Design a protein with these regions (language model features):
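N-terminal cationic and glycine-rich segments that engage phosphates or anionic surfaces
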Residues: 1-66, 72-73, 77-120, 131-134, ...
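Long, charge-patterned amphipathic alpha-helical coiled-coil/hairpin "stalk" segments used as oligomerization
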Residues: 87, 92-194, 202
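Short His-Asn-centered micro-motif
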Residues: 70-73, 163-165
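Glycine-/small-residue-rich active-site loops that bind phosphorylated ligands and cofactors
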Residues: 75-76, 168, 205
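Intrinsically disordered, low-complexity Ser/Pro/Thr-rich segments
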Residues: 254-262
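Short glycine/threonine-rich loop/turn motifs
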Residues: 171-234
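D/E-rich low-complexity acidic segments and tails
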Residues: 241-246, 261-283
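Residue-level signature of catalytic and energy-coupling elements of molecular machines
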Residues: 13, 69, 161, 213
Length: 283
């Protein structure tokens, strides 16, 4: 079953591309027509691409891996933050830190520094510093929190990148390509889809367009997380059942040995009685 349909995308304005003079020829297969100098995207193909991307994202989430969402353009920031947070995925909506992926250990150090400062503020050590030091640390923490707060839980490289505007986030796309990390992206008619593993041809400027696509993709991620949770619960139940069965076996063996031991004296008492009955016959 399709996660979106033609009417939903049409209502959200997903079909509006850029001016003809700004187009990228690589997007030609996804352009339906030109109207008033603006390219119109073929939404039937968009529906198919959304389903492909959503299924892949679902499998990534089901395997317990992370998808990093990237959207630093104004109209996409709040939507991405909301949707990514809802499915417990990391995101970048401020300036993309250069080397975020290719120099990940350095980024992790900055995140740890931010965590250390937070602990200083919580355990009371912060109060023993001078006003100047407190001001410097507060500013440093605010800067780190703004740029890296949303990736604080990202302890290793993400398994995929989801980008809203591939032209604006070209550095993030290049870093992901360099490391072989799959890239999912909303690609408009002015962008190059060649470096994108799962491209979704659609309007990447309108809020409604961005939201309807993110809804479909994040719903798929949520489904993957639920399936993973259910599988782990089943595995836990099976493990507990197996452990109970293992514990039951020694008890059953002990019970059998106890029964055998209680029957043995009875057999020995019957044996002499049988000999006494046979003795007169022998004389």
């Amino acid at each position: 079953m399709a996660r979106t349909n033609f009417d939903m995308l049409l209502e959200a304005g997903c079909h509006f591309g850029h001016l003809k003079r700004k187009w990228n020829p690589a997007m030609a297969p996804y352009i339906f027509m030109e109207r008033n100098g603006i390219h119109i995207i073929d939404l039937h193909k968009t529906v198919v691409k959304i389903d492909e991307a959503a299924e892949a994202l679902k499998q990534i989430a089901k395997s317990g891996k992370k998808v990093l969402f990237v959207a630093t353009k104004k109209q996409a920031k709040d939507i991405v933050a909301e949707k990514a947070t809802a499915v417990n995925m990391p995101y970048v909506i401020e300036r993309w830190p250069g080397g975020m992926l290719t120099n990940f250990p350095t980024i992790r150090k900055a995140v740890k520094k931010m965590t250390t400062i937070a602990k200083l503020m919580e355990d009371g050590t912060y109060g023993n510093l001078s006003k100047r030091e407190i001001l410097q640390i507060s500013r440093q923490r605010a800067k780190l929190e703004k740029n890296l707060g949303s990736i604080a839980d990202l302890t290793r490289l993400p398994s995929a990148l989801f980008v809203v505007d591939v032209m604006k986030e070209h550095i993030a796309v290049k870093e992901a390509n360099r490391l072989g990390i799959p890239v999912f992206a909303i690609v408009d008619t002015n962008s190059d889809p060649n470096n994108i593993d799962f491209m979704i041809p659609a309007n990447d400027d309108a809020k409604d367009s961005i939201e309807v696509i993110l809804n479909a993709c994040c719903t798929a991620i949520a489904e993957g997380l639920e399936e993973r949770k259910a599988e782990r619960a089943d595995e836990k139940a099976a493990k507990e059942q197996s452990e109970e069965a293992e514990e039951a076996r020694p008890r059953a063996r002990r019970a059998r040995k106890s029964d055998d031991a209680s029957k043995a004296p009875v057999a020995e008492e019957e044996a002499p009685a049988a000999e006494e009955e046979e003795a007169p016959a022998a004389e």
